[in-house]
Structures are given as structure tokens and as C-alpha cells.
């Protein structure tokens, strides 16, 4: 059993913790919280050992939470650390704590790529994390783009270039201090946005340019993609590539999927925890080919899309399972869509 320590028990960290619990080859060593808030109390109620920073121990005790130890105690108790801290805090933790211990660490996409030896996406470069000490699971948007492009190339559909336009959610549902509320904000106003270069940390030879705006929604991101293929492919072949690829979901307007809100409602109706939707939701009706040009729209659930990637990254680091066996094991354990998917 791989002992997993999770630093940061917020939007991503708590979901990774639940995903680890669902595995039969991993277990939670503990989670780190810096504030004794309701999330810390939820972690305690889940039976997770809760650790904190040295200067926060007394604050936790006063709040009625007895810490299991400090961050360094958590590192020592873990075989691997998943750092799900806010943006840039992961790098600070690396410099202050992780470098002193011979333990692998998985960072999230909020960190710059050079925090790790390799950027990771299970479909695209699972094997590259093998034996690495520092691995970075790329961001939600980068994960979505990488999955879509890789699903094509894995199924014999070649890509010459990709131009992706992103309508980013303004904030996560719980983020009451973020926006916009009544605006559309270039994010950034310069071209390209950081997503394209981030994709290239995994798909190194892809010609890609991305642009992004932030919009006043909280549920998901929407991507609008123009992809130039290496030749003309039938639309049915492209759709079949998406249909066979794990972690891609084809949403049909005729089945009631007319918006991203309905994708999330579907997740809730399935009984998925928190209404999560880790798959990329490709709108089948949007998939259009014109000669060697491909157009499509797809949704990315920012709160959960990277969760299965973190589980696979753990197995890749330790070499416990080959690529497709790990992806299938993760998908089944998290009850993702597996019907009709090809694992290998």
C-alpha cells in the first residue's frame, strides 16, 4: 500500500483524498491544513490524520482539533506527497520542506512547470513520471486540451496545429471573493494565454495557440477548438476516436445535453460525489470536419478533471502498474464512464 500525504485539503486536495480512499493499493497517511476551519473538521470526521504547520498547532488545539503533527511529520509518514496548495505555495513548500526529504512529490498546475522534472498527463505521457522525484500534474484547462489532442493521435488522427479559445469560469463555486460578476475579462489580454505553452510541456511538438477570457460562471470552463489535421478525416472517425478514449464523454444535444449546467446535473443524478465530472465533455453535435479542419466545443470541470491524473501519477512514479492498467483501475474505482472505452 502506497502511503499518500496530501498537503492542502481544499478544492483539489479533498477530492484527491477521496480518490485515494477509493483505491486498493493506496491509503491516506494524512492531510495538511493551515486553518482549523470546517474543511479541517470534515477531514477529522473522515478519519484522516490532520497535520498543520508548526506555528498553527496551538490554533488547532484551541479549535478543538488535536493535530497529528507538523508538515514534516506528514512527509515522514508518507511514501509520496501530493501538494494541492494554492498557486505558488507548492514551490515554497518544496524549498522549505520537500528538498530535505527523499520523498517524491506531486505538484498541481498552479505551479510553474520548472517546479518539477516532468509535467504529467496519464493519456499522453504516463511513462515519463516513472521514478521521478518531482512531478507536476498540469492544470484543468491544460489537462482538457491534452486529453482532446491525445485522443485524436492515439486513434490515428494526425494533428498539424491547434487553436483553442477558452471561456474560463470566473471562480469555483465556493470562492466568494472572486469574479467577474457582470463582465467578460481577457485572461490574459495577450496572446497566447499560458495554456498553449503549458500543453507543450507534455506534447512538445504540437503547434498550438490559446486565448482565454474569464466569464461570470462557476460550473465549468468551455473550450472552442479549431484543429488543423494532417489530412481530411471523416467526421465519424473523429467521433469514434473520442468515443473510444477514456476520460472523454460525448454529450448529445438530443439526449438533453444543451449546456454545461446539464452536464453537472447529470453528474449529480448519477450520484457522483460533489456533482463532479472528471471527464472532458465533448459536445458531439459540435464536432464538425471541413476538409482537413476540425471544429468542436467541450467542457472542462475545473474542480475534478485532474483528480484521476493524480492517482495515475502516483502509480507511475512507483512503477506499480503499466499505463492502461492504471488508467482503467482509476476510472473504475472512481466510477467514470468506462463503457465502450478502449484501455490499450
From Swiss-Prot:
Gene3D superfamilies: Dihydrodipicolinate Reductase, domain 2, NAD(P)-binding Rossmann-like Domain. NAD(+) binds at residues 11-12, 110, 169, 302. InterPro entries: DapB_N (IPR000846), GlycerAld/Erythrose_P_DH (IPR020831), GlycerAld_3-P_DH_AS (IPR020830), GlycerAld_3-P_DH_cat (IPR020829), GlycerAld_3-P_DH_NAD(P)-bd (IPR020828), Glyceraldehyde-3-P_DH_2_arc (IPR006436), NAD(P)-bd_dom_sf (IPR036291). Pathway: Carbohydrate degradation; glycolysis; pyruvate from D-glyceraldehyde 3-phosphate: step 1/5. Keywords: Cytoplasm, Glycolysis, NAD, NADP, Oxidoreductase. The active site is at 140 (nucleophile). Disulfide bonds: none annotated. Its EC number is 1.2.1.59. D-glyceraldehyde 3-phosphate binds at residues 139-141, 195-196. It comes from the Archaea. Signal peptide: none annotated. GO terms for biological process: glycolytic process; lysine biosynthetic process via diaminopimelate. Coiled coil: none annotated. One of its GO terms (cellular component) is cytoplasm. It is found in: Cytoplasm. It catalyses: D-glyceraldehyde 3-phosphate + phosphate + NADP(+) = (2R)-3-phospho-glyceroyl phosphate + NADPH + H(+); D-glyceraldehyde 3-phosphate + phosphate + NAD(+) = (2R)-3-phospho-glyceroyl phosphate + NADH + H(+). Transmembrane segments: none annotated. One of its GO terms (molecular function) is NADP binding. Belongs to the glyceraldehyde-3-phosphate dehydrogenase family. Homotetramer. This is Glyceraldehyde-3-phosphate dehydrogenase. It comes from Pyrobaculum neutrophilum (strain DSM 2338 / JCM 9278 / NBRC 100436 / V24Sta). The gene is gap.
Amino acid at each position: 500500500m502506497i502511503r499518500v500525504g496530501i498537503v492542502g485539503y481544499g478544492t483539489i486536495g479533498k477530492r484527491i483524498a477521496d480518490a485515494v480512499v477509493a483505491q486498493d493499493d493506496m491509503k491516506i497517511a494524512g492531510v495538511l491544513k493551515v486553518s482549523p476551519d470546517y474543511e479541517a473538521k470534515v477531514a477529522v470526521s473522515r478519519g484522516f490524520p490532520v497535520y498543520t504547520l508548526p506555528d498553527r498547532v496551538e490554533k488547532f488545539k484551541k479549535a478543538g482539533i488535536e493535530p497529528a503533527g507538523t508538515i514534516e511529520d506528514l512527509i515522514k509518514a508518507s511514501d509520496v506527497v501530493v501538494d494541492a496548495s494554492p498557486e505558488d505555495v507548492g514551490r515554497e513548500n518544496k524549498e522549505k520542506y520537500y528538498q530535505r526529504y527523499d520523498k517524491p512529490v506531486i505538484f498541481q498546475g498552479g505551479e510553474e512547470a520548472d517546479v518539477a522534472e516532468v509535467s504529467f498527463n496519464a493519456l499522453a505521457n504516463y511513462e515519463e513520471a516513472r521514478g521521478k522525484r518531482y512531478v507536476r500534474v498540469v492544470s484543468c484547462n491544460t489537462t482538457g486540451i491534452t486529453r482532446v489532442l491525445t485522443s485524436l493521435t492515439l486513434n490515428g488522427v494526425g494533428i498539424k496545429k491547434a487553436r483553442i479559445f477558452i471561456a474560463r469560469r470566473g471562480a469555483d463555486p465556493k470562492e466568494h471573493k472572486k469574479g467577474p460578476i457582470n463582465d467578460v475579462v481577457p485572461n490574459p489580454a495577450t496572446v497566447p494565454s499560458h495554456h498553449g505553452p503549458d500543453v507543450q510541456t507534455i506534447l512538445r511538438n504540437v503547434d498550438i495557440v490559446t486565448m482565454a477570457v474569464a466569464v461570470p460562471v462557476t460550473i465549468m470552463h468551455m473550450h472552442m477548438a479549431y484543429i488543423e489535421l494532417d489530412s481530411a478525416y471523416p467526421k465519424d472517425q473523429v467521433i469514434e476516436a473520442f468515443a473510444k478514449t477514456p476520460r472523454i464523454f460525448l454529450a448529445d444535444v438530443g439526449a438533453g445535453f444543451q449546456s454545461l449546467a446539464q452536464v453537472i446535473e447529470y453528474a449529480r443524478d448519477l450520484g457522483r460525489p460533489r456533482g463532479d465530472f472528471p471527464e472532458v465533455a465533448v459536445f458531439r453535435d459540435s464536432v464538425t470536419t471541413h476538409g482537413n479542419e476540425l471544429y468542436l466545443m467541450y467542457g472542462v470541470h475545473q474542480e475534478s478533471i485532474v483528480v484521476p491524473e493524480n492517482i495515475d501519477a502516483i502509480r507511475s512514479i512507483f512503477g506499480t502498474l503499466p499505463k492502461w492498467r492504471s488508467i482503467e483501475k482509476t476510472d473504475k474505482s472512481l466510477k467514470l464512464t468506462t463503457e465502450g472505452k478502449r484501455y490499450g
